[in-house]
Design a protein with these regions (language model features):
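Conserved beta-strand positions in the central sheet of alpha/beta enzyme cores
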Residues: 33, 93-95, 116, 221
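His/Asp/Glu-enriched, well-ordered alpha-helical/loop segment
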Residues: 68, 72, 141-225
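Structural detector of well-ordered beta-strand residues that form the stable sheet scaffold
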Residues: 73-74, 95, 114-116, 159-161
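Glycine-enriched alpha-helix->loop->beta-strand junction motifs that scaffold or abut catalytic
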Residues: 88-93, 109-115, 155-157, 185
Length: 250
């Protein structure tokens, strides 16, 4: 919801916001995703800003309607302008967030909001978008290592994720784990972003993200030990999903 994005539902006003949430939930949505901000710039002081896609009334209406229906919402938000409004409205996850500032991080940490950084997609699109006249993703690439380190230090919870589009899906989606490790997480902590942390974010603790009796049998097998070589996650030899083998290296 929000902004002129293909196949997205636009709203104007709090009543339309509530109606849009209800419509999506009637279609069976478990989560609502909103596009919280747009038009990113880097200021002379090094901070990033953006334009908000929603008024506070619209944002709060989305949050209250979603949470009141016992569902959750995630926000595509790059800077404090989209992040703070979304978190205060009840967002459970901030998607991308590459231009977040310290106040955003502190608020997210205090409220237990997850950050889904989607680092590889930014790296993938940065050069191409810069050639087309939009260098903001290159700027994010330069600042994100310190942003990530600060967020971890301040206690922001990290969840692994990809994106709905923007890059070649045939490329290894596990590159984010290498970024996580190079910027301070241990290999175990990096893998937990896609297991126990993801389960917590999705409200499925005990069902996914761990190997134990009663949980879904979602298991992968590798030739190398990822605690010693995190890049081995980019070459998965065997995949089981809910007890069914989908990939078996011959």
């Amino acid at each position: 919801m929000g902004g002129k994005y293909t196949n997205k539902q636009e709203i104007t006003g709090a009543d339309e916001a509530r109606r849009a949430v209800r419509e999506q939930l009637e279609h069976g949505a478990d989560w609502i995703k909103i596009y919280s901000d747009r038009g990113y710039i880097k200021q002379p002081d090094g901070n990033y800003r953006a334009l908000s896609n929603f008024t506070l009334e619209e944002m709060n209406a989305i949050g209250s309607e979603t949470i009141g229906s016992r569902k959750n919402f995630a926000a595509h938000a790059m800077t404090r302008d989209g992040i703070i409004a979304a978190v205060n409205a009840g967002a459970k996850s901030i998607e991308h967030g590459l231009g977040m500032d310290e106040e955003s991080m502190q608020l997210m940490a205090a409220k237990g909001v997850f950050w889904c950084p989607t680092l590889f997609v930014n790296e993938f699109v940065a050069e191409g978008r810069a050639k087309l006249g939009s260098p903001i993703n290159l700027m994010f690439s330069k600042s994100i290592p310190e942003t990530f380190k600060k967020a971890v230090k301040l206690g922001v919870k990290i969840a692994y994720g990809t994106d709905i589009g923007g890059y070649d899906w045939s490329l290894p989606q596990a590159k984010d784990f290498s970024y996580f490790v190079s910027w301070g997480l241990t290999p175990i902590q990096a893998m937990q972003t896609a297991t126990v942390h993801a389960a917590e974010l999705l409200g499925q603790v005990g069902q996914i993200g761990e190997i134990k009796s009663g949980a879904l049998a979602d298991i992968i097998a590798l030739k190398q030990d990822p605690t010693k070589n995190i890049e081995s996650l980019q070459n998965i030899d065997w995949i089981m999903k809910d007890g069914k083998v989908y990939k078996q290296h011959k």
